[in-house]
Amino acid sequence: MAHVAKKYKAAAEKVDRAKRYKLDEAMSLVKQTATKKFDETVDASINLGVDPKHADQVVRGAVVLPHGMGKTVRLAVFAKGDKAKEAQEAGADIVGAEDLAEKIQGGFMDFDKLIATPDMMGVVGRLGKILGPRGLMPNPKVGTVTMDLARAVKEQKAGKVEFRVEKAGIVHVPFGKASFDPEKLKANFSAIMEVIYKAKPQTAKGVYVKNVTLSTTMGPGIKLDLAELAAQHA
């Protein structure tokens, strides 16, 4: 543990906690502060000026990252007939209907994402207690309840990430791996911020993006220059 603490301290010392970093510098720094032997995920913590207790201020969405997430996504799809065939041809790993529901009820969870056609939501809905806590319940707002399975499967395979504001008004969203080139991290992050800014609720008052911090899985937080972000997404 002393060795771990020493490595974290060394990484933290590279970051000026009082400074707000420009994007290019932040992306280089986030790579320098990744000290683990595994390829750490890079996350953004975005503090928004919204009150999620009000339904019209719940910010949520999804974005296909230009450079993906650096991992293979195992995808399950609830569909029947021609739609099941469409999902299989698009590259879905598991396709089923009532049979897949029974497997999930029996403990099968060998997938990362779940998509369903609207007509299958009656079956999927009965799995709410299993899927809900794991963040796997399909939702039309993020494109996981759809008739366009070919597109949905390809987007998920390409590295589509979903986000939803939490009770404290914070959005946590991953956007790559520490091994990524800084320019790829920057492109992925910028794609997320573009969607975040466009998702601003009309009823939100005052400053919308109040704080943005980047970090690797086990690394220190790096605060971003908000003026630069606002100018880029004006």
From Swiss-Prot:
Keywords: Repressor, Ribonucleoprotein, Ribosomal protein, RNA-binding, rRNA-binding, Translation regulation, tRNA-binding
MF term (GO), any: structural constituent of ribosome
Gene3D superfamilies: 3.30.190.20, 3.40.50.790
Any one GO CC term of the record: cytosolic large ribosomal subunit
GO-annotated biological processes: regulation of translation; translation
InterPro entries per the UniProt record, alphabetical: Ribosom_uL1_bac-type, Ribosomal_uL1, Ribosomal_uL1-like, Ribosomal_uL1/biogenesis, Ribosomal_uL1_3-a/b-sand, Ribosomal_uL1_CS
Subunit note: Part of the 50S ribosomal subunit.
Role: Binds directly to 23S rRNA. The L1 stalk is quite mobile in the ribosome, and is involved in E site tRNA release.
Family: Belongs to the universal ribosomal protein uL1 family.
Protein name per Swiss-Prot or TrEMBL: Large ribosomal subunit protein uL1
Organism placement in taxonomy: Bacteria, Pseudomonadati, Myxococcota, Myxococcia, Myxococcales
Gene name of this polypeptide: rplA
